[in-house]
Amino acid sequence: TVRHPFTTAGIIPSRVPEDKMLETCYQALHHQLVASAMVVKDCHEIIPGSKVGCMLTKLTTYARTCAPDDELATQAKNLENLFYADVHVWGEYPRLILKMFERKGIHVEMLPEDAATLKAGCVDFVSCSYYMTMTESVDPNAERTPGNTVLGVKNPYLPSTDWGWQIDPKGLRYSLIELYDRYRKPLMVVENGMGAKDVVEADGSIHDPYRVEYFRQHISEMGKAIDEGVEMWGYTTWAPIDLISASTNQMSKRYGFIYVDQDDMGNGTLARSRKDSFYWYKKVIASNGEDLD
């Protein structure tokens, strides 16, 4: 119903007092959650037997060390990330989130009928985006990951893309098992991919083995999660075709299996070309994920 709740991208800082910014963000999120529940309820009534899901920006966080303070900080991060789906699935706010509102002096206006609306509009499945994991530490000097829309502490055991997003295929399996164990609902991965710089050869070919390897490893780990009991309804990539990256406003940060002739300034013919990954992913689709060679 709602994609990536809640990015706060629609909140204009100049119109909100600084001390009310967090409260304003949670108020806007509440409106999204109620609207989602209303849509789910209406869809179920209009189309009996229909299935409606939510979408979570999955940001799995590991503790940087096994120090108890790092573990507690990590737990808080993961609870915050999951609470959106908690409301979608269970139809109510987790008590831990409500207590957090109290501690921070956050007042979210909820209409008397909102509780019943949320409970009547629980989703049937959970979908998520997955790009990376991060770690958490209470150490203020811990190295941070560069260039991300959401900052975290760098994981020394993982490689990174040119934009600092850490590549963690096993983290996808971890995340899917976590979500399925928590919600007992079918899952879908609706965004997964890596931004990379592609080079067009003199003959027009585009060789992107790094993209093939990224998807090979992630799809393989998803298969292992299925083998362990996770019910998966589907998987889609971000994105089939090159497009402007939302996090950096760059065309040169390319995600697609299809190359688009356009640069960061908007120059180019917009002509489209198949990358090597296009032909590889065609085989993956035809084999329903069995052929990853």
Regions found by a protein language model. Name each.
Residues T1-D293:
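Active-site region of glycoside hydrolase catalytic domains
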